[in-house]
Swiss-Prot record:
Subcellular location: Cytoplasm
Statement: the UniProt record of this protein carries the keyword Oxidoreductase: no
HAMAP family cross-referenced by the UniProt entry: OTCase
A cellular component annotation (GO) from this entry: cytoplasm
Family of this protein: Belongs to the aspartate/ornithine carbamoyltransferase superfamily. OTCase family.
Function: Reversibly catalyzes the transfer of the carbamoyl group from carbamoyl phosphate (CP) to the N(epsilon) atom of ornithine (ORN) to produce L-citrulline.
Natural source organism: Nostoc punctiforme (strain ATCC 29133 / PCC 73102)
Amino-acid positions noted as binding L-ornithine in the UniProt annotation, renumbered to this chain: 160, 223, 227-228
Enzyme's top EC category: transferase
Pathway as given in its UniProt record: Amino-acid biosynthesis; L-arginine biosynthesis; L-arginine from L-ornithine and carbamoyl phosphate: step 1/3
Protein name, UniProt field: Ornithine carbamoyltransferase
Lineage of the organism: Bacteria, Bacillati, Cyanobacteriota, Cyanophyceae, Nostocales
Sites where the protein binds carbamoyl phosphate: 51-54, 78, 102, 129-132, 263-264, 291
Length: 306
């Protein structure tokens, strides 16, 4: 996929609808082993936040492509002692072929990408989580054999997942509804970006009513109510977010064929009930597996694997 060769992925707004559709097609081909690609490259993982799925899926994807992975824990690099990001970036780009960064501030990611000559991938920031949404869209496509015209409802905190889901859904022609408590809405600039991409052809709706949002939806999606770095707010958030739990009652308002997604880790009994996450409409485990296939497609595209 030559269009993404050598490019960064800092946000889903960085790619076109066509490029996103081609990535999903490549992920499907790689997953089914219709296509096997190889690249003799080195991926660096610079993660300031805890990670299970992102770390393991990127590592396995790179190994399966024939490449190598170096885990650059900031605590054992000079970053932890205050080395400027621009200095670290200009050193690492002389050793590595590509870098995936998981950090708090989107601005830090953008600084790294500005100074590094190698491609940089957003492996999660407080603002966006584009790689997760690649896997989400792949899972939805597998479930319905299409994306255009479907409706995804996200309930909970207007966090990085809500931001990236708005962009991803707009790019593939899906309607997206975001239901949050008052004061916990997604980033207003990203809302406007998503609406510009949708161009009045699909819906980008913000509401405080989870039942209204869920009604007739084909996908219900949630995430933790307190993200990494917000642990001290968890107890205060609990009563505020309780009406936004994906329960059997909320799921009953969705379309009969609706599926349920969660980016994990899940706090069962909080944002999602045990019955729903373990129920027949849950696609959470397929979604987690698809992190591997979606990110393998992304790496192969950026690195020009053949």
């Amino acid at each position: 996929m030559a269009a993404l060769l050598g490019r960064d992925l800092l946000s889903l707004a960085d790619i076109s609808s066509t490029e996103l559709q081609e990535l999903l097609q490549l992920a499907t081909q790689l997953k089914s082993q219709q296509l096997k690609l190889q690249c003799n490259k080195v991926l660096g993982l610079l993660f300031s936040k805890a990670s299970t799925r992102t770390r393991v899926s990127f590592t396995v994807a790179m190994y399966q492509l024939g490449g190598q992975v170096i885990d650059l824990n900031p605590n054992v690099t000079q970053v932890s002692r205050g080395e400027p990001l621009q200095d670290t970036a200009r050193v690492l780009d002389r050793y590595l072929d590509i870098l995936a960064i998981r950090t708090f501030a989107q601005q830090d990611l953008e600084t790294f990408a500005h100074y590094a000559k190698i491609p940089v991938i957003n492996a999660l920031t407080d603002a966006e989580h584009p790689c997760q949404v690649l896997a989400d869209l792949l899972t939805i496509q597998e479930s319905f054999n299409t994306l255009a015209g479907l409706t995804l409802t996200y309930v909970g905190d207007g966090n990085n997942m809500a931001n990236s889901l708005m962009l991803g859904c707009a790019l593939v022609g899906m309607n997206v509804r975001i239901a949050t408590p008052d004061g916990y809405e997604p980033d207003s600039q990203i809302v406007e970006q998503a609406r510009a991409i949708a161009n009045n052809k699909t819906e980008v709706l913000l509401t405080h009513d989870p039942e209204l949002a869920a009604k007739g939806s084909t996908v219900l999606y949630t995430d933790v109510w307190a993200s990494m770095g917000q642990e001290t707010e968890a107890d205060n958030r609990m009563p505020i977010f309780q009406p936004y739990q994906i329960s059997e009652q909320l799921l009953s308002l969705a379309a009969p064929e609706a599926i349920v997604l969660h980016c994990l880790p899940a706090h069962r009994g909080e944002e999602i009930t045990e019955a729903v996450i373990e129920g027949s409409q849950s696609r959470v485990w397929e979604q987690a597996e698809n992190r591997l296939h979606a990110q393998k497609a992304l790496l192969a595209s950026i690195l020009g694997a053949e």
